[in-house]
């Protein structure tokens, strides 16, 4: 049985993110770097997370906080929602993603729009912006509206009674 890569591609770790996290090769795209950074979090490879942060932004890197978050979380999955740019021929890219994890407070999601820049053929993370969930929009059911259960009765005479 193969050890699947935590980044969610369905490939084995050895043929997916391991060569990037170990430094055997560089990421070819911003999305590939994003996936490998997520994998590094799941394995608490803080050195890789630091090294793939753009040099201009490393002064803001909190190694202790990053290590605590990585080690205290049970990583449950990565979902890439959208990418813009970030291809092999690009110099900038954005990746919107959701990382799911569990900590002492329960299940959590980290929804972010991450920005990447390529310098000398190497992709780097430059910044990330948290995306807040949109409030659920629901319509109020009127008492004289048809019941949502599909009975054909008015709501007030069915489930609203």
Curated annotation (Swiss-Prot):
What Pfam families does this protein's entry cite? Answer: SEC-C, YchJ_M-like
Q: Which organism is it from?
A: Geobacter sulfurreducens (strain ATCC 51573 / DSM 12127 / PCA)
Official protein name in the record: UPF0225 protein GSU1048
**Family as reported in the entry's similarity comment:** Belongs to the UPF0225 family.
